UniProtKB/Swiss-Prot annotation:
Single GO MF descriptor: NAD binding
Any Gene Ontology biological process: UDP-glucuronate biosynthetic process
Function summary: Involved in the biosynthesis of UDP-glucuronic acid (UDP-GlcA), providing nucleotide sugars for cell-wall polymers.
Organism in which the protein naturally occurs: Arabidopsis thaliana
Protein name: UDP-glucose 6-dehydrogenase 4
Active-site annotation: C272
InterPro entries, A to Z: 6-PGluconate_DH-like_C_sf, NAD(P)-bd_dom_sf, UDP-Glc/GDP-Man, UDP-Glc/GDP-Man_DH_C, UDP-Glc/GDP-Man_DH_C_sf, UDP-Glc/GDP-Man_DH_dimer, UDP-Glc/GDP-Man_DH_N, UDPglc_DH_euk
Name of the gene encoding the protein in the UniProt record: UGD4
Induction record: Specifically down-regulated by H.schachtii (cyst nematodes) in nematode-induced syncytia.
EC code: 1.1.1.22
Effect of gene knockout: No visible phenotype.
PANTHER family noted in UniProt: UDP-GLUCOSE 6-DEHYDROGENASE 4, UDP-GLUCOSE DEHYDROGENASE/UDP-MANNAC DEHYDROGENASE
Matches recorded under Pfam families: UDPG_MGDP_dh (PF00984), UDPG_MGDP_dh_C (PF03720), UDPG_MGDP_dh_N (PF03721)
Pathway entry: Nucleotide-sugar biosynthesis; UDP-alpha-D-glucuronate biosynthesis; UDP-alpha-D-glucuronate from UDP-alpha-D-glucose: step 1/1
Regulation of activity: Inhibited by UDP-xylose.
């Protein structure tokens, strides 16, 4: 029986290995992690991550050919293929701080693999890594190999949280990069045969190592670029009276452009987009391409601008102060159908409002109070380091309360901010919410999911990104 081990039981490693176990019953799959609480959660009825469809797959395969363990060295030693899915956070100190990827955990994993291995192995990069990382990993393995042979492959993930299981079942493509040597081609073929159990051959793309590594960074940069492009247009729409939804639709009907990722919003979030673009910027700078670096840096700048613009719109609309005013935040996760809060725009919006001394009440159906308080008290980039390296007891932000009910969150509020596009927010009783709010009652829709006309009929003053402005808002422009 072929044995696969994945180092890292996070948002990528867990779902990916669960689907491989489901689709390949003849392969034994072990997911390992040094975090005891995380592995305990994977072995319980309450999985550590929320992903539609994941629970059923794990329950179906766990204990048969899918195992979760903290015995990292044992499972690495026994594996034929080792996936490495550890964090590659942005460096916070030293050379490249604020831009470069921190490969500390990757290097540590590589050294451990070399140390415990007693047979030849295929080592697969699953984490998003800078171009040429495979070369560095090869050197570490080669100089510590004790005669054992390793083949390095790049197999980047292209999952979208909230639809990860569907993405794994029916991927647009599976990308495998390897060395262009007989041994490299053989390793690529071995991994290709795993995916061929359910992915059509035409959707499995093979490239050299460097192309595969760069393709992942490029894909995320292109997606984020589309979001920043439509968000830049949303600012212009507000200034001219155009409707960004109509503009996006008109643009998206062009077959050369398409309609995906053209929804204006408060900004993009998630673990990958900003981190990968900053990494891309750093790689361009290191390769003597300052103009290219500056081009990609603008994608991040527009995203920051959009979040700042949203906060400024809130404050300026409410008589230029939110001091001691209750502001309800509906949604804290970076997108619907996930509990992931990494780089969520809600963090920056909340911090901006807290800076103006607002009292914030937050409701999200999948994010815990502990996580919200941690996010609002943590320094930038610290979130992407393992939990045991984060502050043990983050400071509680006293101006923030977290509820498990949207109506409780909005009671006596001066304003409601919709920051995650959860479906349930569309069907709330907004007449009830309006009746229990301070007047004038404001709604700031950061995801453009609200029925604006209906809300205005109820009596709300509504701001929706990129839409024609409410007369009230026209008199109080937002300045950045």
């Amino acid at each position: 029986m072929v044995k696969i081990c994945c180092i890292g039981a996070g948002y990528v490693g867990g779902p990916t290995m669960a689907v491989i176990a489901l689709k390949c019953p003849d392969i034994e799959v072990a997911v390992v992690d040094i975090s005891v609480p995380r592995i305990n959660a994977w072995n319980s009825d309450q999985l550590p991550i929320y992903e539609p469809g994941l629970d059923d797959i794990v329950k179906q395969c766990r204990g048969k050919n899918l195992f979760f363990s903290t015995d990292v060295e044992k499972h690495v030693r026994e594996a034929d293929i080792v996936f490495v899915s550890v964090n590659t956070p942005t460096k916070t100190t030293g050379l490249g701080a604020g831009k470069a990827a921190d490969l500390t955990y990757w290097e540590s994993a590589a050294r451990m693999i070399a140390d415990v291995s007693v047979s030849d192995k295929i080592v697969v990069e699953k984490s998003t890594v800078p171009v040429k990382t495979a070369e560095a990993i090869e050197k570490i393995l080669m100089h510590n190999s004790k005669g054992i042979k390793f083949q390095i492959l790049s197999n980047p993930e292209f999952l979208a949280e909230g639809t990860a299981i569907a993405d794994l079942f029916n991927p647009d493509r599976v990308l495998i990069g390897g060395r262009e040597t007989p041994e490299g081609f053989k390793a690529v073929q071995t991994l290709k045969e795993v995916y061929a159990n359910w992915v059509p051959e035409g959707q499995i793309i093979t490239t050299n190592l460097w192309s595969a590594e760069l393709s992942k960074l490029a894909a995320n940069a292109f997606l984020a670029q589309r979001i920043s492009s439509v968000n830049a247009m949303s600012a212009l729409c507000e200034s001219t009276g155009a409707d960004v939804t109509q503009v996006s639709y008109a643009v998206g009907t062009d077959s050369r452009i398409g309609s995906k990722f053209l929804n204006a919003s408060v900004g993009f979030g998630g673990s990958c987009f900003q981190k990968d673009i900053l990494n891309l910027v750093y790689i361009c700078q290191c390769n003597g391409l300052p103009e290219v670096a500056e081009y990609w840096k603008q994608v991040i700048k527009i995203n920051d601008y959009q979040k700042n613009r949203f906060v400024n719109r809130i404050v300026s609309s409410m008589f230029n102060t939110v001091s001691n005013k209750k502001v309800a935040i509906l949604g804290f996760a970076f997108k619907k159908d996930t509990g992931d809060t990494r780089e969520t725009p809600a963090i920056d919006v909340c911090k901006g409002l807290l800076g103006d001394k607002a009292q914030i009440s937050i409701y999200d159906p999948q994010v815990t109070e502990e996580q919200i308080q941690r996010d609002l008290s943590m320094k930038k980039f610290d979130w992407d380091h393992p939990l045991h390296l984060q502050p043990m007891s983050p400071t509680t932000v006293k101006q923030v309360s977290v509820t498990w009910d949207a109506y409780e969150a909005t009671k006596d509020a001066h304003a409601v901010c919709v920051l995650t596009e959860w479906d349930e927010f569309k069907s709330l009783d907004y007449q009830k919410i309006f009746d229990n709010m301070q007047k004038p009652a404001f709604i700031f829709d950061g995801r453009n999911i609200m029925n604006v006309n209906k809300l205005r009929e109820i009596g709300f003053i509504v701001y929706s990104i990129g839409k024609p402005l409410d007369p009230w808002l026209k008199d109080m422009p937002a300045f950045v």
